[in-house]
């Protein structure tokens, strides 16, 4: 069974994009291909000039670690490691020394307003704090692209707005390429381009620079 059918998609460096669709639409499969978690049957996927195709697991892990930052709905923090240790982890796999990776992790936690929470464990933090730790972990390798899979799905409305504002700032101030997968119109409305996918096919692509896509609008709610 083909989950995706004839997808033709370009995401330029520095774009802030959402891929929107209901459960079963194919958006998660597309994200897994973009994140080098799944292979594809035909066609071509190029990431930052590198063709991604039929890689060994070690090569796929190498590219993921150096080119992609992941943000997950469930945060995917390691429960027995504190915040700074969780943020350090991608650098550990890159072979960065302990002192340097600790310094860098503290720098990113400080940027996200969490320096004072560095020694706290995930079960001691709120959902918003855990997602900020996850964002710091995604950023620390200076990836080419951030892939955020339902990043507000486990958060309340207020915290969802804060997380999306943070992603907007990263895109605007650092030129970070960010792709958000969501089924929520309010989340998609915060991005500059909305790609709607249904039954494995891209329905339409909406430029959303004014952030007033229906049904939420500028004064709407996140959920």
Where are these regions (language model features)?
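Conserved beta-strand-loop-alpha-helix hinge in the C-terminal portion
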Residues: 201-223
């Amino acid at each position: 069974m083909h989950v995706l059918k004839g997808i033709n998609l370009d995401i330029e460096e520095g774009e802030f994009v959402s891929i929107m669709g209901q459960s079963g639409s194919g958006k998660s499969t597309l994200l897994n291909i973009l994140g080098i978690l799944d292979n594809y049957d035909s066609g071509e996927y190029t990431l930052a000039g590198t063709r991604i195709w039929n890689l060994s697991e070690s090569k796929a892990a190498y590219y993921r670690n150096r080119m992609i930052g992941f943000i997950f709905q469930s945060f995917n923090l390691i429960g027995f490691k504190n915040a700074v240790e969780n943020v350090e982890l991608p650098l550990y796999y890159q072979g960065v020394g302990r002192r340097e990776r600790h310094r860098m992790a503290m720098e990113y936690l400080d940027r996200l307003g969490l320096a004072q929470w560095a020694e706290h464990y995930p079960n001691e933090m709120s959902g918003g704090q855990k997602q900020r730790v996850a964002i710091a972990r995604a950023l620390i390798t200076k990836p080419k692209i951030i892939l955020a899979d339902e990043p507000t799905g486990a958060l309340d409305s207020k915290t969802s707005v804060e997380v999306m504002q943070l992603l907007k700032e990263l895109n605007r101030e650092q030129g970070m390429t960010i792709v958000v997968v969501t089924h929520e119109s309010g989340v998609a409305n915060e991005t500059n381009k909305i790609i709607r996918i249904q039954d494995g096919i891209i329905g339409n692509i909406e430029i959303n620079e004014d952030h007033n896509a229906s049904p939420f609008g500028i004064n709407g709610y996140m959920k």
